[in-house]
């Protein structure tokens, strides 16, 4: 990009425009001449050097005036991280301003490392209690217990899927009730099975996403030969019908898309409800501002660790 293209986006002040008015070659005032400076020719060793901008200084660097702001090359201060006093560092509030390196960071990744390092010191937070917070299909926030045997093979039919979820959740609930009584009565009596809190997992064969198994691909042209016939019969889940040449109609695709959208909407609503329930138990800062999700989790971690220190 030449420097004349740069200065097309370089906003001039009114003083610069007046300077262009007197130095312009035209008899009339052309305001666009401020954004397309004329070509000046320099002589160097008998060769004519055409510089497309008279803002290119002798040392080759582009020199800017102080009076005007370039909105293109350097970012404005408003686009940097907000310096508003609404951001409260919860670590310095609760830990009395410790000088640890991890405590002074404002970002989430360093926070998580420091929380992980302090978490094993709390004896009351037992890992089997966390198992209630995830169904058997979600692999994000589930801790695998040490006593669990080999995992049963997952089948994509409706028959035996809810039974595994129903058997795993009461055992986890029984283990969590045996742990230290840290939670309120409302939390312990919460019905995790029937509250539709974790039904975002893909259990139904009809509600799978657009590409489910081998049924979306036409196996005859050879472009999507993902498996041979025996494997595709086995992938049909014992339903007895071959899926190879089956085309999905746009109506079915639209139904699946709508079902996936409804699942995602329900998941986000449940997540927001869980955050609202968590904000009820956390101490508020008193500045009439609802904590963001990141600040809520940060406050919850600090609050739980402070309660653990208090119990110890």
Curated annotation (Swiss-Prot):
- Alphabetical keyword list: Developmental protein, Differentiation, DNA-binding, Neurogenesis, Nucleus, Transcription, Transcription regulation
**Single biological process term from Gene Ontology:** axon development
For whether the record's keyword set contains Transcription regulation, the answer is yes
InterPro entries, alphabetically? bHLH_dom (IPR011598), bHLH_transcription_factors (IPR050359), HLH_DNA-bd_sf (IPR036638)
Q: What Gene3D superfamilies does UniProt report for this protein, alphabetically?
A: Helix-loop-helix DNA-binding domain
List each copy of the bHLH domain by range.
255-307
Residue ranges for the region (Disordered) are 136-174, 220-248
Q: Which Pfam families match?
A: HLH
GO MF terms listed in the record are: DNA-binding transcription factor activity; E-box binding; protein heterodimerization activity
Q: Where is the signal peptide?
A: none
In terms of superkingdom, the source organism counts as: Eukaryota
List the record's Gene Ontology CC terms alphabetically.
Answer: nucleus
- Explain what the record says happens when changing residue 149 to A: In strain: Oregon-R, ZBMEL84, ZBMEL95, ZBMEL131, ZBMEL157, ZBMEL186, ZBMEL191 and ZBMEL229
| Tissues in which the protein is found | Proneural clusters and sense organ precursors of the chordotonal organs, optic furrow of the eye-antennal disk and developing brain lobe.
Q: Quote the biased-composition stretches of kind Low complexity, using this chain's numbering.
A: 162-174
Q: What is the effect of changing residue 146 to T?
A: In strain: ZBMEL191
Q: Where in the cell is it found?
A: Nucleus
Q: What does this protein do?
A: Developmental protein involved in neurogenesis. Required for the formation of chordotonal organs and photoreceptors. Seems to bind to E boxes. Specifically required for the photoreceptor R8 selection.
Q: Quaternary structure?
A: Efficient DNA binding requires dimerization with another bHLH protein. Forms a heterodimer with Daughterless.
PANTHER family membership = BASIC HELIX-LOOP-HELIX PROTEIN NEUROGENIN-RELATED (PTHR19290), PROTEIN ATONAL (PTHR19290:SF169)
The name under which this protein is listed is: Protein atonal
Q: What is the lineage of its organism?
A: Eukaryota, Metazoa, Ecdysozoa, Arthropoda, Hexapoda
Source gene? ato
